[in-house]
Design a protein with these regions (language model features):
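Gly/serine-rich nucleotide phosphate-binding loop at the start of the catalytic core
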Residues: 1-83
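Positively charged, helix-rich recognition surfaces that bind polyanionic ligands
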Residues: 3, 9, 22, 79, ...
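A broad, structural surface signal
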Residues: 22-29, 33-40, 86-93, 97, ...
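Short coil/turn segments at secondary-structure boundaries
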Residues: 39-40, 44, 50, 99-111, ...
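Acidic carboxylate diad motif detector
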Residues: 56-169, 299, 310, 316-320
Length: 347
């Protein structure tokens, strides 16, 4: 009987040399241009001939492009370029899914370089290879056309490397690995049961099988960093020239501050969920409908909303607590202990 495997994401920060940074920037630009060109091809084919272009069609076009224009073949690995085309295909699939469901669709957009997150690779060894050090603490990434790049970080569990994403955020480069890991047997010290509900005033309120109450205070990450974030936002607003170096530096400072808050939120959620998962074999909670909970109160011109500012503030508080993140982490940790998770319907 084969061993059960789960896919996990683990992230390392990359430390390229100045020369490697130039090469990575060029790779990112080539993928951004490919994405936009593929989007333009789909739009043009539909508007001019009513023709729908598929992912397979665009892969065939890419093959011709790489054959006829050597600069495209030299720009990036073929399978990596196919992953960029796949990203666009997923964007269209999500668009049509929302249209079918009667939701606000959001047509796929052209991406500026600053809003293009990165590029991906699939099969390990095809244009890239990651070599971890002992215990998967730090390592090195060999990237075709770039060379060997130092990577720093720590994977919680080793496994078989399946795919990777090279990400550019806040002026920094990251490697996000998809790793197939053995389903861990997380230790559990007790076999209790609990049910909980999430809130804004108190982050978590719950009750155990022994009729004991559980409460976790809301850390209010936004309130902790509010003054600094507003100050950094104002610094960006005072520099209207989007091409100026001063504005770019201000934008990077703001993005770095937000990323720091996100890391603190994630670390806190991991600590809290690990502690709870070690105590309870059965956990029940109410299904979350965050989209409905954070819907804007602005209304329409004909029927304007009421207390719009108050609702916007509440939405910010809801999103700041990240209940979806907490629930996701809590669920998989409970299941890894061999426990049971129950999502109770809201109605």
């Amino acid at each position: 009987m084969s061993e059960a495997r789960n896919l996990r994401k683990t992230t390392y920060r990359l430390y390229p040399t100045p020369k490697q940074t130039v090469a990575l920037d060029a790779l990112l630009r080539s993928h951004q241009q490919l994405y936009n060109a593929a989007l333009e091809e789909r739009i043009s084919a539909w508007s001019k001939a009513g023709k729908s272009i598929s992912y397979a069609d665009q892969c065939r076009s890419l093959t011709v492009l790489r054959r006829d224009l050597p600069e495209w073949a030299d720009a990036a690995n073929c399978s990596s370029q196919q992953m960029t085309l796949r990203r666009l295909d997923k964007a269209f699939a999500a668009f049509f899914r929302r249209v079918k469901a009667g939701q606000t669709p959001g047509f796929p957009r052209f991406k500026s370089l600053g809003r293009f997150p990165g590029f991906s690779f699939k099969s390990h060894g095809d244009g890239w290879r990651f070599t971890p050090e002992d215990g998967w603490r730090h390592g090195s990434l060999r990237l075709s056309g770039v060379g060997q790049i130092r990577a720093r970080g720590q994977a919680r569990q080793d496994g078989d490397i399946r795919a990777s994403d090279i990400l550019h955020r806040d002026g920094r480069w990251y490697l996000s690995l998809t790793v197939a890991v053995a389903v861990p047997e997380r230790a559990r010290q007790a076999d209790g049961a609990m049910a909980y509900d999430w809130g804004v005033e108190t982050f978590l309120s719950g009750v155990t099988h022994a009729d004991e109450t559980i409460q976790i205070d809301n850390p209010r990450w936004w309130q902790q960093e509010k003054e600094q974030t507003i100050r950094l936002q104002q610094a960006v607003s005072r520099k209207p020239n989007r091409r100026s170096n001063r504005r770019k530096k201000a934008v990077r400072r703001l993005a770095a501050a937000r990323a720091k808050v996100a890391r603190k939120r994630l670390d806190w959620a991991h600590q809290q969920t690990a502690a709870l998962a070690g105590k309870y074999a059965l956990v029940a909670t109410e299904e979350l409908t965050l989209k409905n909970m954070t819907r804007s109160a602005s209304g329409t011109v004909e029927e304007p909303g009421k207390q719009v500012a108050q609702k916007a503030g509440l939405n910010r508080e809801i999103l700041d607590t990240a209940p979806g993140l907490f629930t996701s982490l809590f669920r998989y940790k409970v299941l890894e202990t061999g426990g049971e998770w129950v999502d109770a319907p809201t109605r």
